[in-house]
Amino acid sequence: MIIIGVVVVIIFILIVGWRSASQSRQKEAIRLATTTSTENSGLLEYILPEFIEKYNREVKVIAVGSGKAFQMGKDKEADVLLVHDRAGEDAFVEQGFGQGRYDVMYNDFVLVGPMDDGLIRQDEQRDILLGFKKIYQEEKAFISRGDDSGTHRKELRLWSAVEIEPESGNYISVGKGMGETLIMADEQLAYTLTDRASYLAMQEELDIGIVIENDALLFNPYGIIPVSAEGADWINQEGGQEFIDWICSDEIQEKIGQYGVEEFGQALFIPNHQ
């Protein structure tokens, strides 16, 4: 009987070990291609530990511009995209590269620049198109991200809306993320377009400030997209869907809405999954 008992215990241990190993294999990391704004703002650092602990699954964050994130999705180098270029997101899904798009949150863009040069009057602080016109007409320095990010794409659409092609020596395209672009604009006392979250997260380091905000044209929605696994069996569909369900859950939506309130007196992102 003792021998039988020992055998049963050994079998039980082997089964448990096999199941544990199997579960470990299933919990492969997911590759999240996302914008630099979600990283620069500190949002991902704030929410991701909860996902990792709950699901025992690592998240490999690749923070790039939205354009680069779309390309990574097309090349099957990411499992999930968290981006902020609605036109690009819709096209990505319509072309079959993504399996749907889900609202996650939004904030807005703001124009930042030197506060004391008098370019933008108080009654003009909600008119982004007028601001862009005046920057061009007065030959003020403007730093463009120039990286095909969601922010860069938004900036180009604003220039197009005022029928201006900014190619003068005062327009500097740097090919950098939001944080580096803000630092360069600050050093050169130049203007730049930024998402509000990135600016607020860095404002203590900057002398430039918000000169135009709260224009409806500056609305900035973020969407999450699972990358299609067609022709790419290495795409982590299970982990990707797990992440999407998690970030869209009531619990994490509430957490997103709390981020920044204590430090900045306002949420850096407004949850809007429905």
Can you describe what each PLM-predicted range is?
Residues 111:
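Serine endopeptidase catalytic core focused on the charge-relay Asp
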Residues 1-54, 67, 71, 77, ...:
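Exported/periplasmic ABC-transporter solute-binding proteins
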